[in-house]
């Protein structure tokens, strides 16, 4: 049996935890550069606020009650996600972090001591009392059925946020699947659901009763696996340790359009520096560094320009200095004056677990001395936050930095921002 714990309205809920005055208020969190609404609290959803609505439109709209908006506070959300993970691990033997707000749990054998749904309610209370966040819990003999159960626990309030689908109660499973639209099934996207609809498959139950061989022939092995999972055959195991990444991408839209080479070089240096940090976090080395730049495709009065260039190193590296140097060389090959650039990024590929490679007799490139020790010191100083020490190439206070004018304090990662309680 698997359980899926999903934090309700995660980003908005994190903002509410440290602001008791917002407990029953409408809260939304904005995307990068305070562009549009992404997460919404339950109260905001009741007001009819849609995901993706631009903030400038929402700001001038009239509602029966005020809507409080926050810029995305990624450090806070990552910290709170880790707290939820720790609390789940205190009650479950094996936990897989599927996303920042979703965790799969291995709950095999739990029912020999306690009813599955009673255990789900224990999980909810343990996380709520320890973090202030509310989770929904869905349980099933497969990951896909656990995901469907979790969907139903949100869809119908009578379940109290907890629902278990077991092999001993097939009628309940079939009833739920008959009510679940096919596009709500885990792993079934919009494109696949449209094709399924043309075949007369509109619900999860109809997909579960489809012939797996037919599904594999007309779609792919992934959807066939989904069909088997809907029928209680576990095909997707728990992954306590995530597989090694095959690519690292660091990119961001600019808060202000970039028009000068110097500003773009600073941005590329910052993205390369962050990508190198992530690479070392994966304990990997890379040989391929790419940089891309592009203008806004929506600026109808300006010509569009986008390009990408890459550099391949003779020796795999995880040294920020090497990665920045390669990224700047790539930028030099694609930079064109006269454009108003909206976005840039750095990509790392071709990973290896060691920095060893076979050099030719006349190769002049040699590994940097004490590179690993220097990077360890650098990462140690910057841990657990970012920006304590950085390379000068990224500048000091660039104007193009991402806009976060409504950013909440770093309640859990900065001493100065720890909330103070006063007794009166």
UniProtKB/Swiss-Prot annotation:
Per UniProt, residues of the UmuC domain are: 2-189
Family matches, as Pfam families: DUF4113, IMS, IMS_C
BP-aspect Gene Ontology terms: error-prone translesion synthesis; SOS response
Molecular function, one GO term: damaged DNA binding
Name any GO cellular component annotation. cytosol
Coiled-coil annotation: which residues? none
UniProt keywords (A-Z) are: DNA damage, DNA repair, Plasmid, SOS mutagenesis, SOS response
Q: Which family does it belong to?
A: Belongs to the DNA polymerase type-Y family.
Give the function comment from the record: Involved in UV protection and mutation.
Which PANTHER family is this protein grouped with? DNA REPAIR POLYMERASE UMUC / TRANSFERASE FAMILY MEMBER, PROTEIN UMUC
Protein name stated in the entry: Protein SamB
- Organism listed in the record: Salmonella typhimurium
């Amino acid at each position: 049996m698997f359980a899926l714990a999903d934090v309700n309205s995660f980003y908005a809920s994190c903002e509410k935890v440290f602001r008791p005055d917002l407990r029953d208020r409408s809260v939304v969190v904005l995307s990068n550069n305070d562009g549009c609404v992404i997460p919404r609290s339950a109260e905001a959803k009741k007001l009819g606020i849609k995901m993706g609505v631009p903030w400038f439109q929402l700001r001038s709209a009239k509602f029966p009650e005020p809507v409080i908006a926050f810029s995305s506070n990624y450090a806070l959300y990552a910290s709170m996600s880790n707290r939820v993970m720790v609390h789940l691990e205190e009650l479950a033997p094996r936990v897989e972090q599927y996303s920042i707000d979703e965790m799969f749990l291995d709950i095999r054998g739990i029912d020999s001591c306690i009813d599955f749904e009673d255990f789900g309610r224990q999980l909810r209370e343990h996380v709520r009392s320890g973090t202030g966040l509310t989770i929904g819990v869905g349980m099933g003999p497969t990951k896909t059925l656990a995901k469907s159960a979790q969907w139903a626990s949100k869809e119908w309030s009578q379940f109290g946020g907890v629902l278990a689908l077991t092999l001993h109660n097939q009628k309940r499973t079939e009833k739920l699947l008959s009510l679940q639209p096919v596009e709500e099934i885990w792993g079934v996207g919009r494109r696949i659901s449209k094709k399924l609809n043309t075949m007369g498959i509109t619900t999860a139950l109809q997909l579960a009763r489809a012939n797996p061989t037919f599904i594999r022939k007309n779609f792919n092995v992934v959807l066939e696996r989904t069909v088997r999972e809907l029928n209680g055959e576990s095909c997707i195991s728990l992954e306590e340790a995530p597989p090694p990444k095959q690519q690292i991408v660091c990119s961001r839209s600019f808060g202000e359009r970039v028009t000068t080479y110097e500003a773009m070089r600073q941005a590329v240096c910052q993205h390369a520096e962050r990508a190198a940090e992530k690479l070392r976090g994966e304990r990997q080395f890379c040989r391929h560094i790419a940089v891309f730049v592009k203008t806004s495709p929506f600026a109808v009065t300006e010509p569009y320009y986008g390009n990408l260039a890459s550099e391949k190193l003779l020796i795999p590296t995880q040294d920020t200095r090497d990665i920045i140097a390669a990224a700047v060389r790539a930028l030099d090959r694609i930079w064109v004056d006269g454009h108003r650039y909206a976005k840039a990024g750095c990509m790392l590929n071709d990973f290896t677990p060691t920095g060893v490679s076979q050099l030719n007799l006349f190769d002049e490139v040699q590994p940097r001395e004490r590179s690993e020790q220097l990077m360890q010191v650098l990462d140690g100083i910057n841990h657990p936050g970012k920006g304590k020490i950085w390379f000068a190439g990224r500048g000091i206070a660039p104007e193009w930095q991402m806009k976060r004018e409504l950013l909440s304090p770093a309640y859990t990662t900065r001493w100065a921002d720890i909330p103070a309680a006063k007794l009166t």
